[in-house]
C-alpha cells in the first residue's frame, strides 16, 4: 500500500482540496492510503471524512488549544464548541474511527475552571459521538520569542492541571497524551535564555541529556563549579536564577535576549496584543 500525506497549515482550506479528494477517489488509487495534517474544525464535513475514510484514513486531528471558549479568545483561536462538536459528528458520519484533539494548559490568565471546561468538552464529545475514539494531546504553554506572550513565564500549576485532566478523562476511556511538564520547563529554559546558557548546554552534552542532567548542569553553572573542560579557560558569566528564567513574568521594559532581532511585529504592537488578550479575564465579558 502506498501512503500519501497531505501537509500544510490548513490543508482542507485549499481552494482545490475538494477536487483533489474527488480525484483521489478514482479506482486507480485503491492501493493508496491518504492522510492529512491537523485540520480546522469548521472544514470537516461528512463528505471530507468519507473521502479520507475511503482512502484508508482512520482519524482526523484538530487543534482546539482549550475547551474553554474564553481561553480560545485569549489566544485568538477562532473556534467555537459547536464547531468542535460538529467536526466530531461529521467525522463519525463519514466513517472515521477516531478524533485527535490538541490543547494546552498553563496559558496566561488560565484558571482551574478553564481546565475543567476542557475535560467537560471531551466528556460531552464522548457522550454525543459514541463509538468515536477520542484522544487529547496536551502540552504546557511555553513562551516563545516575538509573540505577545514572550514576557510570560511557565506556570508551575500547569503540572497539577495535567494531572487533573488525567484524573477526569482516563477513567472514561479517553486517551490522554500529556507532554512531559519537566521537558516543557527545559524548552522554556532554552527559549528564554541568553548567551549565559552556553556553558550549561556544553555541560549537558558531555553528560546525561536528562532532566536531572539539565538541572545539575544549571546548578553547577550558577555556583561556578562547571568542569574546566566545559569553560575551556573562558571566563563564562553565571546564568540567572532558575525561576527568573523559567517562571517569572518579565517586566515590559526588560531587555530581552532577542531584542536585537527584528521580528514581524514590533515591541509596541506585541505589548498591545498582550494587553488585549489579558483583559479577557471575565468569561461574561465575551458575550
Q: What does each model-identified segment do?
A:
Residues 9, 42, 139-140, 147, ...:
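Flexible, active-site-adjacent loop/turn segments at secondary-structure boundaries
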Residues 1-135, 139, 143:
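Conserved SAM/AdoMet-binding glycine-rich loop
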Residues 152-161, 168, 280, 284-287:
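Short secondary-structure subsegments characteristic of cysteine-rich extracellular domains
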Residues 15, 47-48, 70-75, 105-113, ...:
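Flexible glycine/acidic-rich beta-alpha junction loops that bind and position SAM and/or redox cofactors
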Residues 2-3, 30-33, 93, 131, ...:
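Intrinsically disordered or highly flexible coil/loop and linker segments, enriched in small
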Residues 171-287:
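Radical SAM enzyme core and accessory elements
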Residues 54-58, 124-136, 156-176, 201, ...:
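Structural recognition of alpha->loop->beta junctions
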